[in-house]
Amino acid sequence: MSCVSSISSKRSRCEGFDDDFIHTPLKKCSKGYHEWSLSITTPATTPTGKLDYKRKTKSLDDDLISSPVKFGTDANVLNAEFQELSLQKLLVSLSTSDDSKSNPIFHIPELLHRIFNFLDHESLYRCSKVNPVWAAVASSIINKDLVIQQSSISGDLKIVELDQKVHPKSLTFYKLKQHRNFIENQLPRIRFTRLNSLNFYISPVLPAIFDDVTISNNLTKLTIAGNKKINDEELISLILGLPNLIDLDLRACSQISDISIVSIVTHCPKLQSINLGRHENSHLITDLSIMALSELEHLTTVGFSGCDKISDVSIWQLYSKHSTTLVRLSINGCTQISDSSISDIVAKHGFPNLKVLDIRNCQLVRFKNLIQYRDWRHKYLMKPIHIHISDSMKKEFELQEQQLYKEFRTRIVNDLNRWVNEAT
């Protein structure tokens, strides 16, 4: 019986709660809100001043009724009720900021230099406006290497346009086939007094605009790669005032001929590296160019890829003049070069300081001398050499290599047998 009475009492209480909830939805909440008072302070959150709590006896029903967010209220009405409300704007000005309060770590030039090296030129320019220390570090990086390319031409030239002191050591134009007028307008803002490296990568419209610009005669590197429009006359006029040129890259400049090369040798006596590789108009570079280049005293790197009019005569000429100084030799695609030059020269242990030899697509069939030369360099001189061969040559090269090692092992066995027989 006790269990039945307990269940009945619980059911009656629940039914009473349901009735209250149905007829007065906020009655119990309002009652609790009525009794709640702000007269008792909590030390952690309650202000210590005198506060007016006139709303402490206000019911939650009244709060909901007087709230700006009325049920069914139109959005325009809601906006009108809030239009007088505004947020206080916090204005932060770099010009008025106190640098002395910033973290001292951001005033260490060496650390800033390491961080700034990861930024593009437009970001560097913004950093240069923060304070004098940042300006000095950013300027040193900008002035070291200025790269102008299609994807960021506006950002790069903004630096030139706004900074009157841009005098880079290296200036590179990368894949610019348009914007000639824009660049011509900004070019006078660049100072070329410290320039030692000038590079044009697939930018055919640019070299001609330097006709009216005085380039420093201290320029040591000039790259005009992928320019099919520049001719002998334009190139010669560009290099006339460059007596200290050391590195010249003319890859894929298909209009350049022997005439330019002879002029380069005359006006650039300090030249050490030249690349004449091409895929078109290969007949314009002949043995005459190599004969002229071999007269350069400091020549170390030569590239003739695709120049199929160059013959064994040129290789022998290079050997006679630069046997000990040549470091890199690329004759990829020079189909007239045969075993009569390369194989015979390495058999004499010629070019002992050569580090890279590219003989892809040449008419070579005797590789034993090259293999022995490579092993000799590695074992006795401790100067490894990288020999690049084409896929069509690889099979024959490996076959001759295996045969050579087999002969070597046979010779060792014969020597051991002879030694044993002599001992007995």
From Swiss-Prot:
Entry-linked SUPFAM superfamilies: F-box domain, RNI-like
Q: What does the UniProt entry say about where the protein is found?
A: Cytoplasm; Nucleus
Q: Which domain of life is it from?
A: Eukaryota
GO term, biological process aspect, one: SCF-dependent proteasomal ubiquitin-dependent protein catabolic process
Q: Which Pfam families does the UniProt record give? A: F-box
Keyword terms, alphabetized: Cell cycle, Cell division, Cytoplasm, Mitosis, Nucleus
Q: Where is the signal peptide?
A: none
Q: Does the keyword Glycoprotein apply?
A: no
GO annotations of cellular component type: cytoplasm; nucleus; SCF ubiquitin ligase complex
Main location (coarse class): cytoplasm
Q: Which family does it belong to?
A: Belongs to the AMN1 family.
Question: In UniProt terms, what function does this protein have?
Answer: Negative regulator of the mitotic exit network (MEN), required for multiple cell cycle checkpoints. Required for daughter cell separation and chromosome stability. Involved in copper sensitivity.
Enumerate the PANTHER family for this protein.
Answer: F-BOX PROTEIN YLR352W (PTHR13318:SF95), PARTNER OF PAIRED, ISOFORM B-RELATED (PTHR13318)
Q: What is this protein called?
A: Antagonist of mitotic exit network protein 1
